[in-house]
Amino acid sequence: MALTLADVDKIARLSRLHLTAEEKEKSLQELNDIFTMVEQMQTINTDGIEPMAHPHEAALRLREDEVTETDRAAEYQAGAPEVRNRLYIVPQVIEE
């Protein structure tokens, strides 16, 4: 499937892009190269090949679901000008 300049014009119009004649020619060549590559990929026999999310085997190193940090909220909030119910109180910046 090869695109024409009319196709590039339509794509540009739908995308609200303003392309010069030179940009249209370059886009036409690049898009046709992409379609050629896709057509080549479609000819590859993938029967018996399991689909995968990523080409690399990745083993996740999981740890036990245990708390590894202590609650330090009081320590963090000690320097705050005002705290109420573990929430930082800040001046109102948006009028109602």
Curated annotation (Swiss-Prot):
It holds the Pfam family GatC. It catalyses: L-glutamyl-tRNA(Gln) + L-glutamine + ATP + H2O = L-glutaminyl-tRNA(Gln) + L-glutamate + ADP + phosphate + H(+); L-aspartyl-tRNA(Asn) + L-glutamine + ATP + H2O = L-asparaginyl-tRNA(Asn) + L-glutamate + ADP + phosphate + 2 H(+). GO terms for molecular function: asparaginyl-tRNA synthase (glutamine-hydrolyzing) activity; ATP binding; glutaminyl-tRNA synthase (glutamine-hydrolyzing) activity. Its EC number is 6.3.5.-. It is an enzyme of class 6 (ligase). Keywords: ATP-binding, Ligase, Nucleotide-binding, Protein biosynthesis. One of its GO terms (biological process) is glutaminyl-tRNAGln biosynthesis via transamidation. Belongs to the GatC family. Heterotrimer of A, B and C subunits. This is Glutamyl-tRNA(Gln) amidotransferase subunit C. Signal peptide: none annotated. Allows the formation of correctly charged Asn-tRNA(Asn) or Gln-tRNA(Gln) through the transamidation of misacylated Asp-tRNA(Asn) or Glu-tRNA(Gln) in organisms which lack either or both of asparaginyl-tRNA or glutaminyl-tRNA synthetases. The reaction takes place in the presence of glutamine and ATP through an activated phospho-Asp-tRNA(Asn) or phospho-Glu-tRNA(Gln). SUPFAM superfamilies: Glu-tRNAGln amidotransferase C subunit (SSF141000). PANTHER family: GLUTAMYL-TRNA(GLN) AMIDOTRANSFERASE SUBUNIT C, MITOCHONDRIAL (PTHR15004:SF0).
